[in-house]
């Protein structure tokens, strides 16, 4: 199915392995309908509806990355259940590609403001930093190091990333502790 091929979560060990979206999540439905709107919508490039539909897809993918894994845990001897939403790290590559593609798509948009692209780039920078930390926290250290290297490559002017990977992790842990 095309929606899963384009927007589905990927195995971070092998991005050629694509999983289906979890339709229990409302974000999966938002992606589906926004993608339909992009496909069927106006053929005028850069119209407001296209930009808004791209935003819906983009924000829904980020939501799936942050909390799209649904875990149902039986309690009270199976008579009741607790439902937990957890990060779905398999959405990393899909989200990363969406950032790169969306930045490229609107880079040459006539009349675009610098804020449009700069806002996307700031979001991308934060996404990479958060992802490096998330993968580290879940024990995927090598993958976290690759993400951190990409962060340094894409944002060489950012002093806070001109550190070793270990120092980056220590700094992030300190930030998390201070935030409470």
Regions found by a protein language model. Name each.
Residues 139-157:
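TPR/TPR-like (Sel1-like) alpha-helical repeat modules
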Residues 157-159, 165:
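A short, surface-exposed interaction/processing loop segment used at functional sites
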Residues 1-126, 134-139, 178-179:
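Extended ligand-binding clefts on enzyme/binding-domain cores
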Residues 141, 171-180:
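Alpha-helical linker/edge segments of TPR/alpha-solenoid repeat scaffolds
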Residues 129-130, 162-163:
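Alpha-solenoid helical repeat scaffolds
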């Amino acid at each position: 199915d095309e929606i899963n091929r384009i927007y589905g979560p990927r195995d971070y060990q092998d991005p050629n392995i694509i999983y289906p979206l979890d339709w229990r999540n409302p974000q999966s439905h938002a992606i589906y309908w926004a993608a339909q709107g992009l496909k069927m919508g106006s053929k005028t490039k850069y119209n407001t509806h296209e930009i808004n539909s791209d935003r819906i897809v983009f924000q829904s993918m980020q939501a799936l990355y942050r909390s799209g894994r649904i875990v149902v845990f039986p309690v009270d001897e199976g008579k009741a259940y607790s439902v937990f939403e957890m990060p779905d790290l398999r959405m990393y590559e899909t989200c990363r590609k969406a950032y790169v593609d969306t930045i490229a798509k609107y880079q040459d948009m006539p009349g675009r403001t610098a804020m449009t692209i700069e806002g996307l780039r700031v979001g991308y920078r934060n996404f990479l930093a958060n992802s490096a930390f998330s993968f580290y926290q879940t024990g995927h250290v090598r993958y976290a190091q690759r993400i951190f290297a990409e962060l340094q490559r894409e944002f060489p002017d950012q002093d806070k990333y001109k550190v070793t990977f270990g120092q980056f992790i220590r700094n992030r842990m300190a930030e998390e502790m201070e935030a409470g």
